[in-house]
UniProtKB/Swiss-Prot annotation:
The gene is proS. This is Proline--tRNA ligase. GO terms for biological process: prolyl-tRNA aminoacylation. Its EC number is 6.1.1.15. Its main location: cytoplasm. Consists of three domains: the N-terminal catalytic domain, the anticodon-binding domain and the C-terminal extension. The keyword Zinc-finger does not apply. NCBIfam families: proS_fam_I (TIGR00408). Belongs to the class-II aminoacyl-tRNA synthetase family. ProS type 3 subfamily. SUPFAM superfamilies: C-terminal domain of ProRS (SSF64586), Class II aaRS ABD-related (SSF52954), Class II aaRS and biotin synthetases (SSF55681). InterPro entries: aa-tRNA-synt_IIb, aa-tRNA-synth_II, aa-tRNA-synth_II/BPL/LPL, Anticodon-bd, Anticodon-bd_dom_sf, Pro-tRNA-ligase_IIa, Pro-tRNA-ligase_IIa_arc-type, Pro-tRNA_ligase_II_C. The keyword Secreted does not apply.
Amino acid sequence: MSDFIASKEDDYSKWYLDIVQKAKLADYSPVKGCMVIMPYGYSIWSKIQSILDKKFKETGHENAYFPMLIPYGFLEKEKDHIDGFSPEFAIIKDAGGESLVEPLVLRPTSETIIWNMYSKWIKSYRDLPLKINQWANVIRWEKRTRPFLRTTEFLWQEGHTAHATEEEALEETLLILDVYKRFMEDYLAIPVFCGKKSENEKFAGAVSTYSVEALMQDKKALQAATSHYLGLNFAKAFDVKFQDKDGKMKHVFASSWGVSTRLIGALIMVHSDEKGLILPPRIAPVEIIVIPIFKKEDEINKKILDYSDCVVHTLKKAEFRVEIDKDVRSSPGFRFSSAEFKGIPIRIEVGINDILLNSVTIIRRDKDRKFKYQISLDSLVSKVRVELDSMQKDLFKKALNFRTLNTKEIFRSGKDSYELFKAYVNDYSGFVLSCWCGGLNCENIIKNETKATIRCIPDDFKARDLTGMTCIYCSSKAKYYVLFAKSY
């Protein structure tokens, strides 16, 4: 079955697309750039939703839903915002057989319509902070699309908060950044760098943008999440003011932040192999698949099925997410490969020998088939729990080791330093930690000559001394340590 998946080394793009389709995560729709998220793919998104939704509520956020149709005039109120998004707008000019007085934009993001509503809801300091999250779909007319990574329509969550002070809004922005980081590392087993974006790379309409950056197996970076400090920009555009405790009218400060179904693409590209998808246990919709190994005799098969059902019952009672594959028409090998395609963390095989020994045979998805072993039914629950926990940790360690091996530090030490930097980025990719003067010109030249962008000014290296350090391109005094990478 794995013969149907392209080699990662030979054709990474096809390997990725093969997994999307063979694991039945998504399929192409009749609309260019739009995908159909299939039930298994959606079950992963549902798991992401349930975990993050709980975390948002724990930090004081409530869910709401705002219209998908946004008056064009709303977007014109914030110049930087419309300039940044207008090339991606999908606009409705006719409806009900008539031309609309004002065109409507299909939601590219919701800042404008939400802040229009906030102007009605926020009047006093008692109304603050206002912390709302929305689970929704978004339309951005992308020219080059790829399932989950970049599509015309995608699913996401977007948080929008209003605060009395700049300090509170910034605190919120960084709080959510940390929520995202912990989620990526603790649940998705993806090591990430977090940090501030350059002015050139920030969100349209933001004062500052912070991002979560991960490294894929092809050594390209993926922006997995963003959190924006919006300052007073949208409050002023929509005249959102509150009366403070002293009776003075003031504009409110804002943040917005979001993640999308792009996370499913990240899961594929960080962990998977040429057998198919590999899912970290904490995010897998199904943690365990039980596969009975049938024989030709019906009487023996009934015993195998009864025993398998007992195994499933034991695991479900212990609150594991478990399924059983009872397909008698398919060979065990086919069903093993099917489970591997789907990335189910643990496979339990039940054959006649297992029944005789009161045992089961167990194998982890991230291990070679030769590492399968038998365990007694008495120790099933405890052993499965240990293996799931171990797999979660091992996947993170493996991804972290890969990132460490592919994060290079290149600083200016002579006239050939930039040429070395350029050659490394072009030939090897990965993250490159270097120094930057903060100049837009240097940033653009590096981007044009290497196709690498500043992913972020990473928090991990903030404490490093910049004394004597110079910009990798122009040799002027360095202001920041930055991460460069080619990206999706």
